[in-house]
Amino acid sequence: VYGASKLAGERAITAATNRFIVIRTSWLYSSFGANFVKTILRLCAEKPLLNIIADQIGTPTYAADLAQFIAQLIMNDNLQAHTGIYHFSNEGVASWYDFAISIRDIAGLETPIFPIETFQYPTPATRPRFSVMNKKKVKDSFGFSIPYWRDSLEVCIKKIKQ
């Protein structure tokens, strides 16, 4: 089951103490390492066309935005008053297909990308169809301004191209 080990980790933490902060995130990418953004850029250069899942909806999260949030969280004078599970991802929603189209367009590439359904691309773990996170607790607790995913994607692709 997708996410089972993550849930087990959260349960272990909550069972061990009542003073904790867990940050859940989704669809994480950056200019470093292996991730969806870098994979799409590479595949656009290697393949004549791409087929990308269009029926799974979530929110891409730029690792630099997550890191900035965590740094602000740690520096919060009232950190001790905040415990629990917090959701952090960029603002907005997208399908993997929407995300891939944006990556291609921002990078100035022209590879044709076609939408497919999940069943057409089997994976070992079944991913959720809708994984958009509610960030109300993060916003209410810390007043953090969360960038829109496409704006952050532009920043990331600019860094990759440097």
Protein language model features and the residues they cover:
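Conserved beta-strand segments of alpha/beta enzyme cores
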Residues: 19-21, 51, 84, 112-114, ...
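Residues that recognize and position ribonucleotide moieties
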Residues: 21, 50, 59, 92, ...
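Amphipathic alpha-helical segments that line or abut small-molecule/effector binding pockets
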Residues: 64-75, 150, 154
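Mid/C-terminal beta-alpha module of Rossmann-like enzyme folds, strongest
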Residues: 69, 76-124
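Conserved C-terminal active-site "lid" loop/helix of NAD(P)H-dependent oxidoreductases
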Residues: 85, 95-97, 101, 117-156, ...
